[in-house]
Amino acid sequence: MASPLTDRQWLLFLTLLPDVGRKTLRHVLERQQVRRETPAEILRLPDETLREEYRLPPRALRALREERAARLEETARLDAHLTRCGVRWLSFQDAAYPAALEAMPEPPAVLFLYGNHALLDGLTVALLGSHAISAEGLQELEQLAESLMAQGLTLLVSATQPAYQRALLCAVRHGAPYVLALDRGLLRAFGDDLRKEPFKQARVWQAEFDPAHALAISPFRPRDGWLASSGKYRDTLIGYLAGAVIVVEARPDGYIVQLCRELLQHGRTVYVMTQRLDRLPGNRQILEAGATPFTPQA
């Protein structure tokens, strides 16, 4: 990569450095803005400045010094491939970055978007259910999803976890647009050609993901796989990104309860289904935290 790095390439280059996570990447970009340094100027800085001012960890510093040429080439290849496939990535400093995410306890420093970006501008809703959601809960969720889609709302879904999967199937089956939040990188979810439908059961209705009709969003590096912490972070991202959250079935004292309390403290819109309140203490906890009761129309 002989020519100067563009802002887009620089962001990708930093994202791929070892041990550069959300907090470090955010700090690097903020310091760069304050110091008004170009990528080329930063790469010429001594290790001491990169360590103290930019807080780059040891492995990242070593990669800059010993693997720079290879990493610049890797960045160029990945930039060309993702761009050719229609992937867009943006930092928290980008005007198109969803402002709602800045309220997250640890917001993504970078987001990778693949598909119809305009879906984020419309009315979005997330239907939440615990990992152990009951068959009755899934049936209620499906009925609610169909009703909301009929009203023109866009579902926020995921390809893993039963409640999200059921909502995803509803959207695909009805040909409705949806926003797919991932718990791994885009290339890991869709394959290198970014065509594979990541949820096997959805392939009955669509063999390949349709970027014209849906939007996939990932806060993870393109080739990152699933980690134990990825699911909770994905849930948090969905909760903050959604225009409204409707809790179908929550486990008492579980993560959904914790997330909804957090959302309510930030003044976000949280509804909780109440028709089985006597059997769902988790839903009751969310209601007691200040959520709005929600009973689907017959």
Q: What positions do the PLM features span?
A:
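Short, positively charged patches
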Residues: 1-138
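Glycine-biased, small-residue-rich flexible motifs in mid-sequence functional cores and linkers
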Residues: 2-7, 92-298
